[in-house]
Design a protein with these regions (language model features):
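Extended terminal accessory/targeting regions
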Residues: 1-119
Length: 119
């Protein structure tokens, strides 16, 4: 459940900076994405942007997922769990189920190189 509004500043380079903390509660987690975190929302290849934009109903899920993948994330969440959380938020936010599954499959198949191992 979204606990705060997602407020961003467009950096005019395909990236967006949070202007306040974004808080989302899912399962046993309260995920606080900090102010100043930079995201590109969903990393959609240009060829598919006619079908799916990088932002939309999936924006909150994308920001949380980017944060969970980042080195700055203080939560000790493995990549597979981060991807499941992404899928659950997509569903909660009312993203079309087929699109949600496709986005989940995409992060499972192509997200490995972006995941930062927490130490």
């Amino acid at each position: 459940m979204e606990m705060s509004k997602l407020l961003v500043k467009d950096l005019m380079n395909g990236k967006f900076e949070l202007i306040s903390d974004y808080i989302y509660q899912i399962e046993n987690y309260v995920i606080r994405v900090p102010k100043s975190f930079v995201t590109d929302y969903a990393s959609i290849p240009r060829i598919f942007r006619a079908i799916v934009l990088p932002y939309g109903k999936h924006s909150g899920a994308s920001v949380v997922h980017d944060y969970l993948y980042s080195k700055g994330c203080e939560l000790n969440i493995e990549r597979k769990k981060a991807d499941k959380i992404f899928l659950e938020i997509l569903k909660e936010e009312g993203v079309n189920l087929i699109l949600a599954r496709l986005m989940y499959i995409a992060v499972r198949c192509f997200g490995k190189t972006r995941y930062k191992i927490k130490k």
